[in-house]
Amino acid sequence: MTDRVRKPEWLKINIGANERYTETKRIVDSHCLHTICSSGRCPNMGECWGKGTATFMIGGDICTRSCKFCNTQTGRPHPLDANEPTHVAESIALMKLDHAVITSVDRDDLPDLGAEHWAHTIREIKRLNPQTTIEVLIPDFQGKMELVDLVIDARPDIISHNMETVRRISPLVRSAANYDTSLQVIRHISKKGVKSKSGIMVGLGETPEEVETLMDDLLATGCQILTIGQYLQPSHRHYPVVAYITPLQFTKYKTVGLEKGFNIVESAPLVRSSYHAEKHIR
C-alpha cells in the first residue's frame, strides 16, 4: 500500500483557520522563523496554531540529512542566523506560551553540529520568558555526548530525541542516523537527570512485536515519555506507507507502553512528537 491509496476516515482532518491561527502565523512570519509544523506538513498544524502554539525549528530550514520519511528540505544550509535565538524568544513572549517546543534541522556542516546555537536559543528563551517551560527535540549530534551536554547545561525542562522507527526499518529510512546511537543519546540525557522523551512512527512495515521491543529498549535508557503516530508519506519520492494502523491498535500500544513502565504514552493516528506537549511537563 502507498500513501496514494485513499486514507481512512480517522485520518481526515479539518485545517480550518481562526483568529489565533492567523495571529500565530503573523508572529512566525514577521520574525522570519521556521516551524516544523509547516516544513514537516504536520496534520495538527491547524489545531495547534489555532490554540496559539507552534514548534519552532532553529538552525535554518535546510537539513544536511535526507531521511526518507521527512518533508524538510535537504541540501547545503545557509550560515546560522545569529539573531534567531532572540527572535524565537521574542515570538514565544508575544504568543504568551506557557510551554515552548524547539526542534532543529541537522547541521552536520558545522564544527559543533549546531550545539552552541541550541544552547544560546534555550538561554534566550529563559531570559525573556522566565516562566515558560522548554522542551527541545534534538538531533543525535553524531553521538558526541559533549555536544549533547551543551544542550543539557542550558537546562531545558524536557529533552526529546526521536527513535523514529524500529531497529529493522531504521537503516531503510534514517539518513546518517543509527538506532543504537539514538539509544545512547537518550540514555545520556536520562543519566543527567533530565526528563527524556522519544517518538516513533508506525505504518512503515513494523510488527507489534518490534514496537514492543523498541519500547523495552527505550525503557532501558530511562526514557519516560513516548509518542506514537501514523506515518504519512509526504510525497511520491518518500518512503511509502505500508499500512494504516487502526485506532484500536494505537490504543493497544498505549496500554502496553504504560504497563511496561512509561510515565506517559501518547498513541493515536495523528499524534506527533510535540502534540499536546504542554501536558507532558506536569
Residue ranges and their predicted role:
Residues C63, D106-D109, F141, G205, ...:
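Short, glycine/serine-rich, charged loops/turns that create anion-binding
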Residues S66, L110, I169, H236, ...:
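Glycine/Thr-rich phosphate-binding loops of Rossmann-like dinucleotide-binding domains
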Residues I36-C48, D61-T74:
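Local cysteine-cluster metal-coordination motifs and their immediate loop/turn environment
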Residues D61-T64, L97, E164-V166, Y231-Q233:
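Short connector loops/turns at beta-strand edges and beta->alpha or beta->beta junctions
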Residues S38, G59, T103, L137, ...:
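A secondary-structure boundary/capping signal
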Residues M1-T55, T86, E90, K96, ...:
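Auxiliary Fe-S-binding modules of radical SAM enzymes
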Residues T72-H87, L94-M145, I152-Q184, K197, ...:
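Core AdoMet radical
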